[in-house]
């Protein structure tokens, strides 16, 4: 038989009456305005920023009228990451990543703020007057409408003050968020079920003398309700030793040990009771006089008088507001052994704050009941202590989890605390918000810091989101990824250019799929031919440039009109030798050999014509139009020191990207230059690098340079002037080996002390149970954080630059007829199984 008496009892005890105009109204005619609070991300806040947040809270609270209650409630709920395994559109590596992170545990953090207007009598009530101890609650009527209006005006002012700060944002909660809808439970539902689930079901609540139980969960309550429980000094923040060095500081809020650092289900309640400060101080004056008159009878009276006098002296000399405060940690578990461990963990966390942990079993029921959103006025007065606003605010939590970027585009990184995946947009959203003015990136990381893993991880996700990616490499770092894409697209994409004696690198600058040659394409062909003809220190006259341009235009007209002529360097050379030279001789206005020596041009270019030593270079018969290819790798390690080949290869690369940049409207394009930039950034290419970095942003593009040597940055004016100054996104990896040189790096990159501290914390406190490397990402000097590059085994085998591992993958692929995806899948399974043994 259904027991209806319990339901009736719960209904009769329920302290809230209704939601009116967005405010919660209690049966005692008290109104509460509820907010969601957004805090800054963990490990990204400096001491000065903690001070600024503290100051903002203080200013906001000062505008509230007497007999107001500030109740901040932080929820920390253990959850598991749910991978998007049912998404049919995921690539092989994206699905592997989702599977790797699936069910990764983390602590979900949500912050709520409740501002309640009560009265003097109710604020002074003790636990025996709680609504739990009364009979049926008869709703009272709000009688003083003027007080309500003044309170609501103060709340508006409070909201404006907080939202004027850069670090904190508060948003009023709607009725649906508080009481829920048919589809989703509200905050009140979740409080009575102690869960953050979408639609929580109400649980039976047992409020016993020795135990509070909500459903299957047993509650454990630790309180800070007496000055004897508090530390001798408090501050807005404290040094987090695990991520600090002798040259840098990592700061966390004073209350962080009972926040995200406490890895269990818990709610951290922070109460401030704003009373009539002058009346409080008058009462303390009276108490001090009484204690003084009784001091001769008891030393404790004398000590109490000294404490009261000190409190009064500070209040009057510094103009501080006397308030009451209370803080508690409400943790729970359905398992008794786990609850015992949680009890110890909470006690240890409070001890880290130099507080004396007090496990409260006497008032647990009334404190749980007072924690109901909108029911702070039911708080038992004897559980609070007198203090001032400033020290009380030091017990407010001031940081939260890493947040996903509110953008459809981005890359997946991992939270450095729990390893939960974080969706991070470092290109579009920062541009839209004005944080950066270009999408260019500068990446600096020593060998072995995880640089190649990060860049592989980034470009793979850019490619999968529709970007055109062109990579210039010198160490086969992208061979695995390129081969995987080539195989997956059946050769339509994933083009890998490299030089070997058996298969030398070759191009065809005259080939296009559609016979379309715009001005930039024609100019790039002319630049290529001039580079082949003249050395870097030779002067090019206007006549020479003009005649060569005319020859190129005439040849292009020929191949567009007569498709039987194969577009390539050989046919161009023949046209120049057999047709254009004769046309020049027939002209009325002769061009002398001193103005344009076509014979010298033909002689110089002959080595690239069939039969010449470089006849392979510009006569590729593969007919690849790079404009349509979305993933291209130029591996130039073998040619970067060849004075004849390298300038040609460089121009081909640049022409390919500029062609994409100008012709692909509305499509993202990226050029990433690894260590090859040192060769490309030579004197004759300096102007191109400057041009690229300054103009690429106008074409929805981004240029990225990767380097590992600090000295390269400091010594190269091109890097300093063109690359660094035009890269609003800076990405740095482990810099511990350069700690003594870091001041030079900091000055060169224009890093703040905050950014320096973050960078020097990289890999200082890595979880030994997870395989990852950390990376610092800074955006325009305004936003920065350290993230983890954590990948699945499949991604690891694709990205690895370790020779033995690459050979293992390629050998397995060869055994499978070139199927690199199956090879990676098989090896990943084998390696995971070996780890389990």
Question: Which role fits each region the language model picked out?
Answer:
Residues 427-449, 453-460, 469-478, 495-503, ...:
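Conserved P-loop NTPase motor cores
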Residues 132-161, 353, 445-450, 798-823:
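Short, cationic low-complexity segments
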Residues 1-399:
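Extended, folded cores of ATP/NTP-driven motor/assembly subunits in large transport
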Residues 85-90, 127-132, 374-377, 484-489, ...:
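Short secondary-structure boundary/capping segments
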Residues 23-29, 102-107, 317-322, 414-416, ...:
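Short glycine/proline-enriched loop/turn "hinge" motifs that connect secondary-structure elements
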Residues 47, 51-63, 355-356, 366-422, ...:
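P-loop NTPase motor domains
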Residues 100, 516-570, 717-837:
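P-loop NTPase motor core of the ASCE superfamily
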């Amino acid at each position: 038989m259904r027991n209806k008496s319990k339901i009736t009892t719960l209904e009769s005890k329920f302290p809230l009456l209704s939601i009116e105009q967005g405010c919660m109204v209690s049966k005692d005619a008290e109104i509460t305005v509820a907010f969601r609070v957004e805090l800054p991300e963990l490990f990204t806040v400096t001491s000065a920023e903690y001070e600024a947040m503290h100051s903002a809270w203080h200013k906001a609270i000062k505008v509230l009228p007497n007999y107001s209650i500030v109740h901040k409630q932080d929820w920390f709920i253990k959850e598991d990451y749910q991978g998007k395994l049912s998404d049919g559109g995921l690539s092989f590596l994206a699905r592997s990543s989702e599977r790797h992170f699936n069910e990764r545990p983390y602590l979900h953090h949500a912050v709520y703020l409740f501002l309640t207007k009560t009265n003097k009598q109710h604020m002074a009530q003790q636990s025996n007057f709680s609504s739990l101890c009364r009979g049926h609650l008869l709703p009272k009527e709000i009688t003083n409408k003027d007080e309500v209006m003044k309170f609501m005006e103060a709340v508006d002012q409070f909201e404006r003050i907080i939202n004027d700060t850069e670090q904190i944002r508060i948003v009023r909660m709607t009725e649906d968020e508080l009481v829920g809808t048919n589809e989703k439970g509200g905050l009140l539902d979740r409080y009575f079920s102690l869960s953050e689930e979408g639609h929580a079901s109400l649980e039976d609540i047992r409020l016993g003398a020795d135990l509070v139980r909500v459903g299957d969960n047993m509650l454990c309550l630790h309180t800070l309700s007496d000055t004897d429980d508090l530390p001798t000094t408090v501050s807005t923040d404290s040094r987090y030793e695990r991520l600090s060095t002798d040259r840098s500081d990592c700061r966390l809020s004073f209350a962080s040990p009972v926040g995200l650092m406490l890895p269990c289900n818990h709610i951290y309640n922070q109460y401030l009771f704003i009373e009539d400060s002058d009346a409080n101080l008058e009462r303390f004056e009276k108490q001090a006089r009484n204690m003084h008159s009784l001091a001769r009878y008891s030393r404790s009276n004398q000590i109490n008088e000294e404490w009261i006098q000190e409190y009064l002296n500070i209040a009057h000399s510094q103009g501080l507001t006397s308030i009451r405060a209370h803080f508690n940690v409400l943790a729970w578990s359905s398992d008794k052994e786990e609850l015992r461990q949680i009890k110890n963990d909470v006690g240890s966390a409070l001890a880290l704050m130099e507080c004396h942990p007090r496990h409260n079993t006497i008032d647990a029921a009334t404190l749980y009941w007072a924690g109901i959103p909108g029911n702070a006025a039911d708080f038992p007065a004897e559980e609070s202590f007198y203090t001032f606003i400033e020290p009380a605010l030091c017990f407010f939590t001031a940081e939260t989890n890493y947040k996903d970027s509110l953008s459809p585009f981005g890359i997946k990184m991992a939270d450095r605390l729990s390893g939960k995946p974080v969706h991070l947009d470092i290109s579009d959203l920062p541009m839209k918000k004005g944080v950066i003015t270009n999408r260019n990136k500068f990446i600096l990381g020593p060998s072995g810091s995880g640089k190649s893993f990060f860049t592989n991880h980034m470009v793979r996700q850019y490619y999968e989101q529709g970007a055109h990616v062109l990579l210039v490499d010198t160490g086969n770092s992208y061979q695995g990824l390129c081969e995987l894409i080539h195989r997956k697209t059946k050769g339509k994409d994933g083009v890998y250019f490299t030089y070997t004696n058996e298969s030398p690198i070759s191009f065809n600058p005259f080939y296009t799929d559609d016979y379309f040659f715009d001005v930039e394409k024609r100019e790039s062909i002319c630049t290529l031919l001039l580079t082949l003809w003249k050395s870097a220190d030779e002067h090019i006259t206007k006549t020479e440039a003009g005649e060569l341009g005319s020859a190129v235009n005439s040849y292009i007209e020929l191949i567009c009109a007569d498709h039987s002529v194969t577009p390539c360097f050989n046919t161009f050379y023949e046209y120049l030798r057999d047709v254009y030279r004769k046309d020049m001789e027939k002209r009325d206005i002769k061009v002398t050999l001193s103005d344009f020596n076509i014979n010298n041009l033909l002689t110089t270019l002959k080595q690239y014509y069939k039969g010449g030593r470089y006849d392979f270079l510009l006569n590729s018969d593969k007919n690849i139009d790079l404009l349509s290819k979305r993933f291209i790798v130029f591996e130039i390690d073998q040619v970067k020191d060849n004075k004849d080949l390298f300038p040609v290869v460089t121009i081909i690369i640049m022409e390919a990207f500029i062609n994409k940049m100008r012709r692909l409207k509305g499509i993202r394009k990226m050029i990433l230059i690894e260590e090859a930039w040192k060769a490309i950034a030579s004197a004759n290419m300096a102007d191109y690098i400057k041009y690229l970095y300054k103009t690429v942003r106008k074409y929805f593009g981004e240029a990225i340079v990767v380097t590992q040597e600090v000295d390269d940055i400091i010594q190269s004016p091109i890097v300093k002037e063109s690359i660094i100054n035009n890269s609003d996104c800076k990405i740095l990896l482990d810099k511990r080996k350069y700690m003594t040189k870091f001041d030079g790096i900091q000055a060169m990159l224009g890093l703040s002390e905050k950014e320096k501290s973050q960078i020097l914390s990289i890999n200082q406190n890595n979880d030994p149970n997870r395989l990852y490397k950390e990376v610092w990402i800074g955006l325009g000097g305004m936003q920065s954080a350290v993230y983890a590059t954590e990948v699945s085994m499949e991604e690891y085998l694709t990205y690895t630059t370790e020779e033995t591992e690459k050979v293992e993958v390629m050998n397995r692929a060869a055994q499978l007829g070139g199927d690199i995806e199956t090879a990676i899948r098989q090896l990943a399974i084998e390696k995971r199984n070996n780890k389990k043994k």
